[in-house]
Amino acid sequence: MKNSAICTATLSWNDQGTPISTQFDDVYFSNQDGLEETRYVFLNGNCFPQRFCTHSRSSCVIAETGFGTGLNFLTLWQAFDAFRQQNPDAPLKRLHFISFEKYPLKTNDLKAAHQRWPELEIFSQQLYQQWPQPLAGCHRLIMANGAVTLDLWFGDVNDLLPTMDSSLHGKIDAWFLDGFAPAKNPQMWSEQLFTAMAQFAHPEGTFATFTSAGIVRRGLQQAGFNVSKIKGFGRKREMLAGVLATQKYQPLPAPWFARPSASHNDDIAIIGGGIAGILTALALLRRGAQVTLYCQDVAPAQGASGNRQGALYPLLNGSNNGLEKFFTSAFTFARRQYEQFSAQGIDFDHQWCGVSQLAYDEKSSKKIEKMLATEWPNELAIGMNCHQLSEKCGLDIHHHGIHYPQGGWLCPAELTKAATELAQQQGMLCCFNHQVTALSHNQHGWQLHLMHQGQSLNAQHKTVVIANGHHLPQFEQTEKLPVTAVRGQVSHIPTTTDLSQLQNVLCYDGYMTPANPANQHHCIGASYQRHRLDNEYSETEQQENRDRLLKCLSDAEWVNQVDVSAKQSRQGIRCVIRDHMPMVGNVPDLNKIMTDYQDLPEKIRTGSPITDAPCYSNLFVIGALGSRGLCSAPLSAEILAGQIFDEPLPLDNEILATLHPNRFWIKKLLKGRKLKIEKP
């Protein structure tokens, strides 16, 4: 599906104050009482809230066709919240709601639709605060301190379902089959939809729907559901409800990109004290895991996560490929998460001042032209001429470009340190000054071999996440991962009267931030030195940072005030990869891949059974975040935690494949090229 702006719903309102979709000429809920209709049809029809009490797993997963006003979600959340307050010791801790919506409402329309139900306000306010841009794809919203997850998939449900990742197979406990009436919206009520409902349903998963149309009843029966007609709501004579009776076997697509969950998710070690490790820890803690973090430094954020200012904006390329799709989703998720951190009292310097990417030469101009050929929501990206950019930036900018209104800058060092403190408050055990030198697998899980103050130690954990930045290849299990260490130097520039006028982040063949009010310095950067691992100050790189700015904005007089003579800077080492995508998932077992998967193309051609690509059990990686960890780390951490806990993931199968740690080797094999066994 194209990752771009989608049409929002256009509404009218009838005499009863009920919203009507002009696209479908149908009401969003009953004129009689929408809230009671939801409780009767979708909650009672699926045996909620009573069913919460007998649910034996920690998470209950609900899927819905047609989010509409969100009334079904809010009503179920209200019931779940009451259940949790009355049953704090029950096994069920979390609610995961997945909904598909072709025409999302605007925020103001959403608020107007909810006015008649003040009892839902405590829940609807949280929805408004995170309501996403009208951007195709999945938007994950985390609410109630992690107890409630809402995955909003914007787009046509029948276009989206074939792209869903195998993490959804067999996970849905109940379906809310909503959407406009079959007579008004016949395209949605398809055989493809009913088949997918059965495929994604948990064994004995249920469904309920307001309609009793024969095409719906027969379609669900053919898909494998036992279907019953029951009394409809209000004046409606009948509705349908049922349970999955027969789950037809469906071979999972692309087993070479399988994502096995952890067989043990209660005891997890994380190696690394940067933003990737800390955000992964928080995501795991939200799910109830016991987390121990090992960091070779004396404090968090001593590596690449320790900079004063880092820019946050999406990575667009106009190609509608996995990279662009991932980074648009990652950016919007990151903004939501950072705002939640602020609301939780995590204190870190930041300004959501916008980011302006400049067309400073012919190559960058063509690149931006290609990016703007896609119709993006104005909240995400908007093209501007040089006069508009100058007004937006507060300084003369003699170039056109693209502006990201919701971008900005934040302090990675402060964010990482404050997030670490929050994780510790939530129960994470931190072992600083503990260097993990090796990993070995045994019958109890993974043994970590440590050095602490000159002494050799061992620690045992069931599951391990490697999040150690450019040190990623240091272990035997990860030494062949195709990542590269790249040094970068960021220059710290004292502000001046003119430079202090800069209102947003500038991106050119480098970047420059507005002055941080806390220290009255700008950051410009950053150099790019491959395979250099020292953290020493470089005068050459300091001058290169300044020269790039002067070259790209040669017509602007104010750039001459950029003074690097004080030699203030910070050096760090990035972990980068050729395709610029993070590595998120299971650590692949390359030796077994080379023995078990060399004939992959032949097996595909002949239809022979293909096992999942070999990987190390209960060993995971989040790395290769490069220069964009502030953007990619929050969503990457959420994906990894979801995988470890065997949850539905908030990206489609195409994007998840581009994040898989084995992707380079699998791509070679799929092209018919043999993998060479390299001698150590």
Curated annotation (Swiss-Prot):
It comes from the Bacteria. Disulfide bonds: none annotated. One of its GO terms (biological process) is tRNA wobble uridine modification. Residues 1-245 are annotated as: tRNA (mnm(5)s(2)U34)-methyltransferase. Gene3D superfamilies: D-Amino Acid Oxidase, subunit A, domain 2, FAD/NAD(P)-binding domain, Vaccinia Virus protein VP39. It is found in: Cytoplasm. Its EC number is 2.1.1.61, 1.5.-.-. Residues 271-680 are annotated as: FAD-dependent cmnm(5)s(2)U34 oxidoreductase. It holds the Pfam family DAO. NCBIfam families: MnmC_Cterm, PRK01747.1-2, PRK01747.1-3, PRK01747.1-5, tRNA_MNMC2. Catalyzes the last two steps in the biosynthesis of 5-methylaminomethyl-2-thiouridine (mnm(5)s(2)U) at the wobble position (U34) in tRNA. Catalyzes the FAD-dependent demodification of cmnm(5)s(2)U34 to nm(5)s(2)U34, followed by the transfer of a methyl group from S-adenosyl-L-methionine to nm(5)s(2)U34, to form mnm(5)s(2)U34. In the N-terminal section; belongs to the methyltransferase superfamily. tRNA (mnm(5)s(2)U34)-methyltransferase family. In the C-terminal section; belongs to the DAO family. This is tRNA 5-methylaminomethyl-2-thiouridine biosynthesis bifunctional protein MnmC. It comes from Photorhabdus laumondii subsp. laumondii (strain DSM 15139 / CIP 105565 / TT01). The gene is mnmC.
